[in-house]
């Protein structure tokens, strides 16, 4: 729900009156696509419900989760390649960092769920996942004219 609100706010912020700069139009389209795709992946992750007590059910749920996390990593990689308009160029570093953190998170989740589970590796994956989303939140806060440190 929070991601939907962020998407709506971003759409409103980036919608202006009159003619719009082509770079801003492209940026807005790419940001909207990124937010839509995150929302979809988030919904898919939250719908992974076929975890049963048997190994087959757990294996299927794990495969589904890994597939969605891989899609998430792909979306963050695309996000890092978005060309930010000149006024927001300085935010590109946050998009790059978000992608790097998500790649590390997904790699770590694969290790946790497919290779060798350890609490420390799961914590490491969660921390990188959180850091990735924190960078996205900073970008969205700035685009909304809010103080990301507040």
Residue ranges and their predicted role:
Residues 1-4:
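Positively charged n-region of N-terminal signal peptides that target proteins for export
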Residues 13-16:
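C-terminal motif of bacterial Sec signal peptides marking the signal peptidase cleavage site
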Residues 18-20:
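Bacterial signal peptide processing site
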Residues 26-100, 104-150:
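Alpha-helical segments in soluble extracytoplasmic regions
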């Amino acid at each position: 729900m929070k991601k939907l609100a962020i998407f709506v706010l971003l759409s409103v912020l980036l919608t202006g009156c009159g003619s719009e700069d082509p770079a801003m139009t492209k940026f807005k389209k790419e940001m909207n696509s990124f937010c839509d795709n995150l929302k979809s992946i988030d919904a898919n992750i939250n719908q992974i419900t076929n975890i049963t007590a048997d190994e087959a059910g757990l294996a299927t749920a794990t495969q589904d989760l890994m597939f969605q996390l891989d899609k998430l990593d792909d979306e963050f990689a695309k996000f890092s390649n978005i060309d930010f308009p000149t006024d927001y160029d300085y935010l590109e570093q946050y998009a790059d960092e978000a992608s790097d953190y998500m790649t590390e998170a997904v790699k770590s989740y694969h290790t946790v769920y497919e290779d060798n589970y350890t609490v420390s590796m799961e914590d490491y994956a969660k921390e990188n996942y959180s850091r990735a989303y924190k960078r996205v939140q900073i970008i969205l806060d700035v685009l909304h004219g809010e103080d990301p440190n507040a």
